[in-house]
Regions:
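Short, surface-exposed beta-strand/turn "edge" patches of beta-sheet domains
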Residues: 1-4
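A composition-driven surface/loop motif
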Residues: 7-176
Length: 176
């Protein structure tokens, strides 16, 4: 006796849960698929894992995120936090060649007086009716929150959005 069977397995691509990551995270795009790798940014990355473009929760303290030059499209942040308080590098870097839109809630902090919380070397667009991006340097002697490198597109803000400076070190993008 024999039987033929077709088996189809569908898997749902999940959000990237930063609370489950214990190392630096690199975000990339392969065709239509968002990918991430978890490894020290300065070392060879491990195999990429797919995620659905949503990033949530808090990355381990002292770890960083890189959005590489293949990244093109919308990233949705669900109460995401990057707290790289002790690292001598930006907590979040957007590489030259990346063209990304941020939506949702993202808080990025650094505690190193010589570093920015966010360094934008690419194109960054802020979208969404309830989006809030916070970029803070928690070191009392620093005024560095966000850096926009020469040659990059600063920040595109949708209608009704504006950048607010709070104190000397914190910047928030507010949508009205």
């Amino acid at each position: 006796m024999s039987a033929d069977a077709d088996i189809t397995v569908e898997t749902e691509v999940q959000p990237l849960d930063l609370s489950q990551r214990s190392n630096d995270v690199t975000i990339s795009k392969d065709g239509d698929d968002w990918k991430y790798t978890e490894a020290a940014i300065t070392k060879t990355a491990t195999a990429a894992t797919s995620f659905n473009g949503t990033i949530k929760n808090t990355l381990a303290d002292g770890k960083r995120m890189l959005i590489d030059n293949t990244a093109q499209g919308v990233l949705i942040f669900e109460s995401a936090k990057i707290n790289s308080t002790s690292t001598a590098a930006p907590a979040l870097t957007i590489e030259n060649g990346a063209n990304v839109s941020f939506s949702g809630s993202l808080e990025v902090k650094t505690g190193n007086a010589d570093q920015y919380a966010i360094r934008n070397n690419g194109i960054l667009t802020i979208t969404g009716a309830s989006t809030m991006i916070t970029s803070t340097n928690t070191n009392g002697s620093s005024d560095k929150g966000m850096d926009v490198s020469a040659g990059s597109v600063q920040i595109h803000l949708s209608k009704g959005m504006y950048l607010v400076k709070i104190g000397e070190k914190t910047y928030k993008i507010v949508i009205r």
